[in-house]
Each structure stands twice: as C-alpha cells, then as structure tokens.
From Swiss-Prot:
Described function: Involved in transcription antitermination. Required for transcription of ribosomal RNA (rRNA) genes. Binds specifically to the boxA antiterminator sequence of the ribosomal RNA (rrn) operons.
Key words, A-Z: RNA-binding, Transcription, Transcription antitermination, Transcription regulation
GO molecular function list: RNA binding
UniProt family annotation: Belongs to the NusB family.
Highest taxon of source: Bacteria
Alphabetical list of InterPro entries matching this protein: NusB-like_sf (IPR035926), NusB_fam (IPR011605), NusB_RsmB_TIM44 (IPR006027)
Gene Ontology BP terms: DNA-templated transcription termination; transcription antitermination
Name of protein: Transcription antitermination protein NusB
Organism: Mannheimia succiniciproducens (strain KCTC 0769BP / MBEL55E)
Gene3D superfamilies: NusB-like
Length: 143
C-alpha cells in the first residue's frame, strides 16, 4: 500500500484561504479593513501565501461588497444575511474574482471556492457554493 503525499496548497490557494478567513473576521467584527488585515497578518502563519494577492482579494472584495452582494442575490435561496458567515465569505470572494479578476479562468475560481469550502465550510457547503457559482459564472459571461 502506498501513502498519498499531501500536496501543499499553492500560494494563491493560501491567499484565498487567508482572504476568506479575513473576510469572515471583518464580517463578524465590523472593524475597519486595515485593522482586520493587520491583526490577521500579525496573528496568522502567512508562510507560503501570495501576499500581494491576499491583500488585493481582501481589500477589493470588501470594497466591492455592495456590487458582489447584488450580483449573487438572485442566485441565492435566501438573503445574504441568512447565509452561514463562512459561506458568505467564500461566495463574496469567489464572486469578486469572477466579476473583477478576469485573468483568472472561471473554472479555477469555482474550483478554488469549492476547495476552500471543503476546508472551512460545513459538511455540504461546498455543494451549495458550487451550485451558486455555477449559475453566476454564465450570467457574468464567464463561460
């Protein structure tokens, strides 16, 4: 029997994971972006993280929350306020990437969101996130 070698997440995956955690903290605490970012970077192990991408994702997602939320609202089965905070953070980040980071292929955005949901979300949240993003991508002409 062979052992599977667990692959380290890519620097961009780590940036997405950290951005989701920072977004979660921002949503819960309502502290200023700068405070959340500084606290997060100070308190977390940022080794192997694409720091410029982390900062861009976190700051730009927060800056674009109204646009991101209005984009995803028609595809949710409940209001954004009723979503689990981790699911909301993952969806916000992914919708931001789908809408504004056009150099990132939509399949990569969706797959990364699913993987982050498997790591941080509830048992079946990755299925919910996949379903929502799979509907949003074509609406943004990303397919």
């Amino acid at each position: 029997m062979t052992e599977q070698v667990k692959k380290r997440p890519s620097p961009r995956r780590r940036a997405r994971e950290c951005a989701v955690q920072a977004l979660y903290s921002f949503q819960i605490s309502q502290n200023p972006v700068e405070t959340v970012e500084l606290s997060f970077v100070t308190d977390q192990d940022m080794k192997g993280v694409d720091m410029p991408y982390f900062r861009k994702l976190f700051r730009q997602t927060v800056e674009n929350i109204p646009s991101v939320d209005s984009t995803m609202a028609p595809y949710l089965d409940r209001s954004a306020n009723e979503l689990d905070p981790i699911e909301k953070a993952i969806l916000r980040l992914a919708v931001y990437e789908l809408k504004y980071e056009l150099d990132v292929p939509y399949k990569v955005v969706i797959n990364e969101a699913i993987e982050v949901a498997k790591t941080f979300g509830a048992e079946d949240s990755h299925k919910y996130i996949n379903g929502v993003l799979d509907k949003i991508a074509p609406a943004l002409a990303r397919k």
